[in-house]
């Protein structure tokens, strides 16, 4: 089949780079822009979607990004995303302004540029959930301000 004019806009098999905090038996997750921009796309984007099926601390240390990040925590039942069988602990802010938020429902979190955030700890997982992030940047690594948290 001949290449079409718009083929570059269809990214097939967008597998993500395995995060160092990932349990060894974790399923591969999907993601784009983790280590390199998507070839042929004009807008910068990094995105990850991964199943969470057991408790673990994904990101143990706080970090910042040079741009905003959107995190999402979604119930794993595709017929009822409101069914959220997990408890997630997520920290935003630093020092006396640090707040620990407990996520027990399908939730989106906007993290402004420069705001210290994490640890991210999946404390209880009774049923699988989906976790992901979106950033309008050419790569995830390009946005880290300071030392890498993982």
Predicted regions and their residues:
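Short acidic (Asp/Glu) patches
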Residues: 53-57, 92-97, 113-117
